[in-house]
């Protein structure tokens, strides 16, 4: 079983913001896999389905970003899934808009959602797909920046990155993470 967690904040006012790219990737996967992500369980919107022979759980935590670990620890304990089969997708200010990066494990850096997850799981030994949202301009508040929407001139690049992130996660599930990293970490 694979658990794919997209990080974001619940509520209309956060839709399509930089901080919610994880939710956007889950929406793409849900459509692609014909999985309805509408059931409320484990402080999250979840949907279960199959990708090939693999059972897949798509997850959009509803706890707000900084408490995302509460959702994931509940799911981890309930489903008894291997850490290597938990894939977290989230925004990264250290990557330019349009870029993605896949890692088998590692720190969450300055990302508060990832800090919450690694703290609650007691490990950072799980795959993650980072979607570039770029850095704020000099003097711009980081919180305001990540809660902002993409500029019109960024829309093609971010849409391409979201599709690429969904394809990379599909590759992780259908093939393996090493193949996905070779294919998408360019």
Swiss-Prot record:
GO MF: peptidyl-tRNA hydrolase activity; tRNA binding
EC class (word): hydrolase
Chain sites annotated for binding tRNA: 14, 64, 66, 112
Residues at the catalytic site: 19
NCBIfam families hit by this protein: pth (TIGR00447)
Main function: Hydrolyzes ribosome-free peptidyl-tRNAs (with 1 or more amino acids incorporated), which drop off the ribosome during protein synthesis, or as a result of ribosome stalling.
Protein name in UniProt: Peptidyl-tRNA hydrolase
Organism listed in the record: Clostridioides difficile (strain 630)
């Amino acid at each position: 079983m694979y658990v794919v967690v997209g990080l974001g904040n619940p509520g209309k006012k956060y839709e399509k913001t930089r901080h919610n790219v994880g939710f956007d990737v889950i929406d793409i996967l849900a459509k692609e896999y014909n999985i309805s992500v509408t059931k409320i369980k484990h402080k999250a919107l979840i949907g279960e389905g199959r990708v090939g022979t693999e059972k897949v759980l798509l997850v959009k935590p509803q706890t707000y970003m900084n408490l995302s670990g509460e959702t994931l620890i509940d799911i981890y304990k309930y489903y008894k899934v291997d850490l290597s089969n938990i894939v977290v997708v989230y925004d990264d200010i250290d990557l330019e808009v349009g870029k993605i990066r896949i890692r088998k494990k590692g720190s969450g850096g300055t990302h508060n959602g990832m800090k919450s997850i690694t703290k609650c799981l007691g490990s950072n030994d799980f795959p993650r797909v980072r979607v570039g949202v770029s850095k704020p301009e000099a003097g711009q508040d980081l919180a305001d920046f990540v809660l902002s929407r993409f500029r019109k001139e960024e829309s093609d690049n971010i849409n391409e990155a979201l599709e690429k992130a969904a394809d990379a996660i599909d590759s992780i599930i259908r093939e393996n993470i090493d193949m996905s990293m070779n294919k998408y970490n360019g």
